[in-house]
Swiss-Prot record:
Its EC number is 1.1.1.402. It comes from the Bacteria. Keywords: FAD, Flavoprotein, NADP, Oxidoreductase. One of its GO terms (molecular function) is glycerol-3-phosphate dehydrogenase (quinone) activity. Catalyzes the oxydation of D-erythritol 1-phosphate to D-erythrulose 1-phosphate. This is D-erythritol 1-phosphate dehydrogenase. The gene is eryB. Pfam families: DAO (PF01266), DAO_C (PF16901). Its cofactor is FAD. InterPro entries: DAO_C, DAO_C_sf, FAD-dep_OxRdtase, FAD/NAD-bd_sf, G3P_DH_FAD-dep. PANTHER family: GLYCEROL-3-PHOSPHATE DEHYDROGENASE, GLYCEROL-3-PHOSPHATE DEHYDROGENASE, MITOCHONDRIAL. SUPFAM superfamilies: FAD-linked reductases, C-terminal domain, FAD/NAD(P)-binding domain. Gene3D superfamilies: Alpha-glycerophosphate oxidase, cap domain, D-Amino Acid Oxidase, subunit A, domain 2, FAD/NAD(P)-binding domain. It catalyses: D-erythritol 1-phosphate + NADP(+) = D-erythrulose 1-phosphate + NADPH + H(+).
Length: 502
């Protein structure tokens, strides 16, 4: 039998936390392997509300530390990846029967001041009868508030962390479940099997970090044959996508009768993303889907506030994700903490660091603190480095995306503006690697519809572990929303026959 490949840190899970840990650790000089059983971000991390935010509603549950840390991270990430993260203004129509105005004002005051806000504008009060933001809102709502948060392309955030990890020397394995992990001589023997090829590999790792998200306890019990007193609480969150039904770049946040809040955000130009629900989930994470009751719930919440009424047939697409929240014993799924918790098991001198909970916004800090927990295992590793480091594509002067975008348009005068915008927003400073020297549209290869060309496909396969048409259409990009059914089918057929994937 071949000698196992050696590494310092073996990361299980290719969602945002796993990719973040792999990048952080590799940048400290550790030899890192990450294994993901499906595609990067295929689980929870591509099915979020796509916000980098402090979490305004968490203030009601007195999560002041969590909100403060998330607000601080919001600015860090805005600087690190201004191409995939950008500021958004949220309009909150005031509904007196749901929360008194003084309470909303207090929450927004705290939100403005808890995190040392530097870049984003503060809160302002709106007269919905006079201010243009009130135009689509029903006349019964006369007062509102406007505040700042940030938007993020969640699946690309994961992919860019994985790219960043690989550029620091990490090995990234997708569609590669860990089939077994056992302690041996103060370390771990980890066996993986590639689902596509059947190839098995064996690694000798000093330490495992379990970032399996909804599957974290499966890994603890069934893969590592370990135990933990901690647990996750699975909470299902569903979103719907509809045609955008208001003018303006602002988003809306509405209060529902059940005290939950619903985001109504501009999405992919001419669409709107509406969510989320919060429902305790008992099923397999792989099987999660938005049900009719949830879709009706979201439509009803929107129709309470807007003049234009959504109907079921307006729903273009829906998706659902399972949030693996740390089980803090709270009964109400909305009240369960969004904070993260580490559980370090050093049985036999072979450390297993299990990660419970967390949210997109705090992934970088989670990774950094996770590495602090392992400092005694790797005393020679480098120090913290990610706070001021751009993510791949985010190497943009002063994190000034607008100036960068103008330069990009000047660089590629032959490109339609929508295509320059698409490349700039997904790839940032790496756009030149996607274009790969092309001098005209024909140089980008086959055109699949919309702003979708062959050069982008080849880049994603070569640089971002895209293995299937679905990986590209739904996660590395959102082309599925901009192609006709016939165009999608034609691309899938072309991709399946092009033999691009080694």
């Amino acid at each position: 039998m071949a000698e196992p490949e050696t590494c310092d840190l073996f990361v299980i899970g290719g969602g945002i936390n796993g990719a973040g840990v792999a990048r952080d650790a590799a940048g400290r000089g550790l030899k890192v392997v990450l294994a993901e059983k499906d595609d990067l971000a295929q689980g929870t991390s591509s099915r979020s509300g796509k916000l980098v935010h402090g979490g305004l509603r968490y203030l009601e549950y007195y999560e002041f530390r969590l909100v403060r840390e998330a607000l601080i991270e919001r600015e860090v990430l805005l600087n690190a990846a201004p191409h995939i993260i950008w500021p958004m203004r949220f309009v909150l129509p005031h509904s007196p029967q749901d929360r008194p105005a003084w309470l909303v004002r207090l929450g927004l005051f705290l939100y403005d001041h808890l995190g040392g806000r530097k870049k984003l504008p503060g809160t302002r009060t709106l007269d919905l009868k006079r201010d243009p933001e009130g135009t689509p809102i029903l006349d019964q709502y006369t007062k509102g508030f406007e505040y700042s948060d940030c938007w993020v392309d969640d699946a690309r955030l994961v992919a860019l962390n994985a790219v960043g990890a690989a550029e620091k020397g990490a090995t990234i394995l997708t569609r590669t479940p860990v089939v077994s992990a056992r302690r041996e001589n103060g370390g771990w023997i980890v066996e993986t099997r590639n689902s596509d090829t059947g190839e098995t590999r064996t690694f000798r790792a000093r330490c495992i970090v379990n970032c399996a998200g909804p599957w974290v306890t499966d890994v603890i019990h069934n893969v590592a044959a370990s135990t933990s007193s901690r647990n996750v609480r699975l909470v299902k969150g569903s979103h719907i996508i509809v045609p955008k039904f208001w003018s303006g770049a602002n988003a809306y946040l509405v209060q529902n009768h059940d005290k939950r809040v619903i985001f109504i955000n501009p999405y992919e130009g001419d669409k709107a993303l509406i969510g989320t629900t919060d429902i305790a989930y008992e099923g397999r994470a792989e099987d999660v889907a938005a049900d009719e009751k949830e879709i009706d719930y979201l439509i009803t919440a929107v129709n309470r506030y807007f003049k234009e009424k959504l109907r079921r047939e307006d729903v273009l697409h829906s998706f659902s994700g399972v949030r693996p929240l740390f089980d803090d014993g709270k009964g109400n799924p909305s009240a369960v903490t969004r904070d993260y918790v580490f559980d370090l098991d050093e049985t036999g001198g072979a450390p297993l660091l299990n990660v419970f909970g967390g949210k997109i916004t705090t992934f970088r800090e989670l990774a950094e603190r996770g590495m602090h927990r392992l400092k005694h295992i790797f005393p020679q590793m480098g120090g913290d480095w990610t706070h001021d480091a751009p993510l791949p594509g985010g190497e943009i002067a002063n994190a000034d995306y607008e100036t960068f975008a103008n330069t990009l348009r000047d660089t590629y005068p032959w490109m339609p503006r929508t295509l320059v915008h698409h490349y700039g927003r997904l790839y940032g400073a790496r756009t030149k690697d996607v274009v790969a020297g092309a001098q005209n549209l024909e140089g980008l290869g086959r055109h699949f519809g919309g702003d979708f060309h062959e050069a982008e496909v080849r880049y994603l396969v070569a640089r971002e572990w895209a293995k299937t048409a679905e990986d590209i259409l739904y996660r590395r990009t959102k082309h599925y929303l901009h192609l006709t059914e016939a165009e999608r089918a034609a691309f899938v057929e072309w991709f399946d026959n092009a033999n691009l994937v080694a």
